[in-house]
Amino acid sequence: PCDVWSVGCIIFEYYMGFTLFQTHDNREHLAMMERILGPIPSRMIRKTRKQKYFYHGHLDWDENTSAGRYVRENCKPLRRYLSSEAEEHHRLFDLLEGMLEYEPTKRLALSEALKHPFFSVLQLQPAPKAWDSNRDISR
């Protein structure tokens, strides 16, 4: 499941041209995740070993700091990054939402992601033979 998350982040980067979570700070990373993907599920907050990042079941994050303002101004809900209203763009973001699901048990497996409607336009056909072994080339 974590590999699928990483692939989702990479696909987003290919689409937009920049990384989804541009930070090395753990707390800021969590704030970006909440801003882009919505609140972290309370069950996950209760089970984390990183309780220092949370207070009363919510991310302990001050939006009035320079980092807080940066996240507020530069991160937006995932679907707001759509650059087109075309159907294939909506299918891509549906795929990304499945790949970036917080809950690992609800996140798309790689095999499921590959069967997603976004990829349906890629009709898998047998590769053409590069070499026909019955052909006589001796002349």
Task: Please describe what each predicted stretch is.
Residues 3:
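Conserved catalytic-loop aspartate of Hanks-type protein kinases
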Residues 14-15:
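Hydrophobic anchor on a C-lobe helix of Hanks-type protein kinase catalytic domains
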Residues 18-25, 107:
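Activation segment of protein kinase catalytic domains
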Residues 30, 93-96, 110:
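Hydrophobic alpha-helical patch in the C-lobe of Hanks-type protein kinase catalytic domains
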Residues 39-97:
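C-terminal lobe substrate-recognition/regulatory segment of protein kinase catalytic domains
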Residues 98, 105-139:
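Regulatory extensions flanking the kinase catalytic core
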